[in-house]
């Protein structure tokens, strides 16, 4: 049995048990050799559609690493920003009425490494419908400081910085990475949630409510197909997809669990226990994940629609990710 078939078996079992509607697994090596396997359905309500290799996925927080981290580090290389400079060097209006506010001291590097006091998440979409007003809310809110956690706010602010650096009002006005998009044809997309806020099954439009309300954000919103995700990973493996300094930074530890933008192996991490210390990875709430092992010269992406039609269900995604990673890295 090929590696792709063995590694796909845990996902196939969850699809057969109707815990996840469908998914795609892809593996790519540094020499460009790739394998992809697909099963299940892209949508089960209110209509039924089969999953294919060309299905578009809402990549959710993979946006943070595929798009935002890469663009921020490109801006560093171009001399447009400095990693240890505060965000106010680009966002001077951040907490502008409180010159001594702690938010004004937060740096780009701290946001990339989730080393700030921002909360994990905030229902920004509940504060209004106007995306410009919501941007002002994010910038002027007196955030309650807490222990450093993985925070969407860090990357929302990095997205606002990219808007300012590029002179656009919306992040989605910028071109995404090659092969990616900010939305997709619903007929070719994996459905996500039956959204009680937007009164419809989301398909081809962003699942994250804050990203939707902001009309584009640095923490979510990117869409892609399995081969585009594998192409991105291959570009990092062989050095063709980013500068040497950018690749070095995304591999450089900032803490026990994180590099610049990415996660690194720790006990219980989603990539499993068998990958090398030279692995980086990230997951997305919708059921996506990407891991790149620079030592072994291999990357793998697992894309599912595990939140369809609801997130309030034990899909088994956490155990699935680890099981797939362990199989891939034990061969």
Describe each region flagged by the PLM.
Residues 2-57, 80:
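Short, conserved catalytic-motif segment at the N-terminal edge
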Residues 8-12, 25, 31, 58-84, ...:
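Active-site SXXK
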Residues 12-14, 56, 98-99, 275-280, ...:
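Short, P/G- and charge-enriched loop/turn segments at secondary-structure junctions
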Residues 35-37, 290, 297-306:
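Short, well-ordered beta-strand elements
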Residues 36, 43, 98-279:
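Short, surface-exposed loop or secondary-structure junction motifs
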Residues 82-99:
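Short, glycine/proline-biased beta-turn/loop segments that scaffold the active-site neighborhood
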Residues 215-221, 279-291, 304-310:
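Glycine-rich phosphate/pyrophosphate-binding beta-alpha loops
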Residues 251-256, 267-269, 309-331:
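Short, gly/Ser/Thr-rich active-site loops of penicillin-recognizing serine hydrolases
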């Amino acid at each position: 049995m090929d590696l792709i078939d063995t590694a796909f078996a845990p996902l196939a079992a969850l699809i057969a048990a109707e815990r996840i509607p469908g998914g795609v697994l892809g593996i790519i090596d540094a020499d460009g050799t790739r394998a992809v396997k697909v099963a299940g359905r892209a949508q089960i309500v209110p209509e039924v559609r089969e999953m294919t290799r060309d299905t578009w996925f809402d990549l959710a927080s993979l946006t943070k690493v595929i798009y935002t981290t890469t663009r921020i580090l490109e801006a560093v290389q171009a001399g447009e920003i400095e990693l240890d400079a505060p965000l106010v060097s680009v966002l001077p209006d951040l907490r502008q009425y409180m010159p001594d506010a702690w938010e004004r001291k937060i740096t780009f590097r701290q946001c990339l490494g989730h080393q700030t006091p921002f909360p994990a998440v905030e229902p920004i979409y509940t504060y209004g419908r106007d995306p410009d007003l919501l941007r002002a809310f994010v910038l002027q809110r007196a955030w309650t400081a807490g222990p450093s956690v993985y925070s969407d706010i860090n990357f929302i602010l990095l997205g606002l910085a990219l808007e300012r650096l590029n002179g656009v009002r919306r992040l989605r006005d910028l071109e995404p990475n090659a092969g990616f998009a900010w939305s997709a044809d619903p007929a070719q997309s994996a459905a996500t949630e039956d959204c009680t806020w937007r009164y419809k099954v989301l398909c081809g439009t962003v699942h994250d409510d804050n990203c939707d309300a902001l009309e584009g954000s640095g923490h979510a919103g990117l869409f892609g197909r399995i081969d585009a995700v594998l192409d991105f990973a291959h570009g990092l493996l062989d050095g063709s997809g980013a500068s040497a300094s950018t690749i070095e930074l995304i591999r450089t530890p900032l803490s026990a669990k994180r590099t610049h933008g990415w996660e690194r192996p720790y006990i219980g991490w989603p990539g499993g226990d068998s990958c090398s210390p030279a692995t980086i990875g990230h997951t997305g709430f919708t059921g996506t994940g990407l891991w790149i092992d620079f030592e072994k010269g291999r990357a793998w992406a697992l894309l599912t629609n595990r939140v369809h039609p609801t997130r309030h269900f034990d899909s088994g995604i956490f155990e699935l990710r680890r099981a797939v990673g362990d199989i891939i890295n034990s061969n």
